[in-house]
């Protein structure tokens, strides 16, 4: 298999893994990741105005046809001695060029990025970037050679094995500092996700114990990650644990304790108020549908039935949005579908 095909497989493997591991990654995580990996601001110098103008003027030759209206995504950073600072921005730059594969050959991509470095970077950063790029290419090629673990994909051990093999592969091509810069943010999230899965899948823990451990795990995250992941992560944890408690016939107290451990007293109070509102809505809709069915089963004319149902709907649901909402339940019931109540 030639190198370009292996690069392609490497890209495919990364895409497959990211579908799994970034299943709750918020859209602005990339920004958070950049903040996590940032070095002391005083040690970083931005590209000079002259260099910025040059990069803007030379954007088109480096992009593919599908990227003709975009700027080159290469926010490379240098320190005061013009040494390359290896961080997620560096990796993003490499990946920007690699996404052109298919529209351009790997040889053309390689030449483009070298030309880009020549035009945009002073020495010694230029040579450092080119050397790192060559090693990154080899790393991506070897990703395509990694063997899939002989473990069911439903088992967390499968993903642990995949990430372990990737970490070992990185050590062949990069220093510890480079690994931290290129992959540090990804590793933080990967480790968090794997540990979170392990807690949720631990049958030896009660839902209350899971909530405590999930809260402790979340509290260990860097502050920037907490800000991005808090809502999505906790909502998903709440959904899974709540479903489990209800499925197993858990008590209201167990549900209360789980929520309190996971999101605190104030949020639990709001959730319990929402439970009351949902319960009232479910009761009202169920009663309305029963009365509506009685009308439909009566001997009245079709016109009389529709008038009676409209009057019944207006009586039970005064808010216009509720009247529209309940019609979705009417349709579901008429078609023999499950009623779309929120749980």
From Swiss-Prot:
The keyword Transferase does not apply. GO terms for cellular component: plasma membrane. InterPro entries: Lipase_chaperone. Pfam families: Lipase_chap. The chain crosses the membrane at residues 7-27. Keywords: Cell inner membrane, Cell membrane, Chaperone, Lipid degradation, Lipid metabolism, Membrane, Transmembrane, Transmembrane helix. GO terms for molecular function: unfolded protein binding. It comes from the Bacteria. It is a single-pass membrane protein. One of its GO terms (biological process) is protein folding. It is found in: Cell inner membrane. Belongs to the lipase chaperone family. This is Lipase chaperone. It comes from Acinetobacter baylyi (strain ATCC 33305 / BD413 / ADP1).
């Amino acid at each position: 298999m030639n190198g370009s095909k292996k690069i392609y497989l490497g890209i495919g493997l990364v895409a497959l893994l990211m579908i799994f591991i970034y299943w709750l990654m918020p859209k602005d995580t990339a920004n958070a990741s950049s903040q996590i990996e940032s070095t002391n601001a005083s040690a970083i110098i931005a590209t000079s105005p002259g260099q910025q103008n040059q990069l803007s003027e030379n954007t088109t030759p480096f992009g593919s046809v599908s990227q003709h209206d975009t700027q080159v995504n290469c926010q490379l950073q240098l320190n005061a001695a013009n040494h390359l600072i290896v961080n997620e921005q560096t990796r993003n730059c490499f990946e920007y060029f690699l996404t052109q594969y298919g529209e351009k050959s790997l040889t053309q991509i390689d030449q483009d990025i070298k030309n880009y470095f020549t035009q945009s970077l002073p020495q010694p950063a230029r040579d450092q970037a080119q050397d790192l790029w060559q090693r990154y290419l080899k790393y991506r090629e070897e990703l395509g050679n990694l063997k899939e673990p002989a473990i069911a994909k439903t088992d967390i051990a499968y993903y642990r094995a995949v990430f372990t093999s990737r970490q070992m592969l990185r050590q062949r091509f990069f220093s510890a500092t480079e690994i931290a810069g290129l992959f540090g943010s990804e590793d933080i999230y990967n480790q968090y996700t794997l540990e979170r899965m392990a807690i949720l899948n631990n049958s030896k823990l009660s839902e209350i114990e899971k909530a405590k451990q999930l809260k402790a795990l979340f509290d260990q995250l860097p502050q920037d990650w907490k800000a991005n992941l808090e809502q999505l992560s906790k909502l998903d944890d709440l959904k899974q644990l709540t479903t489990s408690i209800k499925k197993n016939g858990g008590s209201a107290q167990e549900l209360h304790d789980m929520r309190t451990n996971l999101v605190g007293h104030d949020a639990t109070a709001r959730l319990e108020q929402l439970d009351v509102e949902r319960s009232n809505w479910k009761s009202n809709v169920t009663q309305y549908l029963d009365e509506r069915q009685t009308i439909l089963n009566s001997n009245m004319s079709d016109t009389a039935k529709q008038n009676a149902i409209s009057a019944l709907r207006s009586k039970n649901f005064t808010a216009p949005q509720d009247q529209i909402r309940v019609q979705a339940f009417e349709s579901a019931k008429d078609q023999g579908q499950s009623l779309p109540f929120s749980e």
